[in-house]
């Protein structure tokens, strides 16, 4: 059996998140989907898996809502559903950053496409000749599986630690074009908004994150795999899963608890 795995997020005003959560839960359960959906006033964040027809029908229904018409979904395949359950949760944020002064609903973070970034990586600088620094917004557990060659990484275990950890390196970034990246784009979007609000106007987000980069241009300039928070453990640049029984067993225990 071929399972379609999806990742998507969208910052958009949702005034009644619980109502939407109930609707998504009903449609997802009927379709037999597995995974997690997070909903907040600021938007939606989805990691879902299922058979092709079920996935296509679900996203066709969701994107018929004008609020989600621009939702960009990233796809990969596996031989099994990498999630044990189907969960829909209402949260204060769709990715926890705990910076109330940062709102993607008010302004979007400027970004760079995968194809443009690949060109910059080949040259080692942006289109204006300014040196390029890749800034990983993920935690150390994720980074251990892979990151962009020569990327700056931070000693954090949670995304909320990003601002404090970055403070020690600000001077090193002042003369560079900084491209922040994460798994699918949601964390680096908030990170870039905060950095720009904090006076760093030379920062961009990688549109679509690492998975979008893999999907569009492959693994050029990237060392290793991209960690994902499910039973696939990590994906290579061809979006193929790594199957590690020890990590899968650990994940299964956390799903049950």
From Swiss-Prot:
Residues 128-222 form the Rhodanese domain. InterPro entries: Rhodanese-like_dom, Rhodanese-like_dom_sf, TrhO, TRHO_N. It is an enzyme of class 1 (oxidoreductase). It holds the Pfam family Rhodanese. The active site is at 182 (cysteine persulfide intermediate). The keyword Aminoacyl-tRNA synthetase does not apply. Its EC number is 1.14.-.-. Keywords: Oxidoreductase, tRNA processing. PROSITE patterns: RHODANESE_3. It catalyses: uridine(34) in tRNA + AH2 + O2 = 5-hydroxyuridine(34) in tRNA + A + H2O. One of its GO terms (biological process) is tRNA modification. One of its GO terms (molecular function) is oxidoreductase activity, acting on paired donors, with incorporation or reduction of molecular oxygen. NCBIfam families: PRK05320.1. Belongs to the TrhO family. Catalyzes oxygen-dependent 5-hydroxyuridine (ho5U) modification at position 34 in tRNAs. This is tRNA uridine(34) hydroxylase. It comes from Xylella fastidiosa (strain Temecula1 / ATCC 700964). The gene is trhO.
């Amino acid at each position: 059996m071929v399972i379609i795995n999806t990742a998507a997020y969208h910052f958009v005003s949702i005034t009644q998140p619980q109502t939407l959560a109930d609707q998504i839960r009903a449609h997802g359960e009927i379709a037999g989907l597995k995974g997690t959906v997070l909903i907040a006033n600021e938007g939606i964040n989805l990691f879902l898996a299922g058979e092709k027809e079920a996935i296509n029908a679900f996203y066709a229904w969701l994107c018929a809502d004008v609020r989600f018409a621009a939702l960009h979904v990233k796809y990969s395949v596996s031989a099994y559903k990498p999630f044990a359950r189907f969960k829909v949760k209402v949260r204060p944020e769709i990715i926890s950053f705990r910076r109330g002064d940062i709102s993607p609903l008010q302004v979007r973070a400027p970004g760079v496409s995968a194809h443009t970034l690949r060109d910059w990586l080949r040259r080692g600088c942006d289109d204006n000749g300014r040196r390029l620094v890749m800034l990983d917004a993920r935690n150390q557990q994720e980074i251990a599986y892979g990151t962009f060659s020569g990327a700056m990484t931070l000693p954090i275990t949670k995304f909320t630690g990003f601002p404090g950890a970055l403070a020690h390196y600000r001077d090193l970034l002042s003369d560079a074009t900084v491209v922040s990246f994460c798994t699918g784009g949601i964390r680096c979007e908030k990170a870039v908004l905060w950095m720009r609000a904090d006076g760093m106007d030379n920062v961009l987000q990688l549109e679509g994150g690492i998975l979008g980069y893999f999907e569009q241009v492959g693994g050029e300039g990237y060392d290793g795999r991209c960690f994902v928070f499910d039973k696939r453990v990590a994906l290579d640049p061809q979006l193929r899963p790594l199957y590690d029984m020890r990590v899968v067993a650990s994940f299964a225990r956390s799903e049950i608890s």
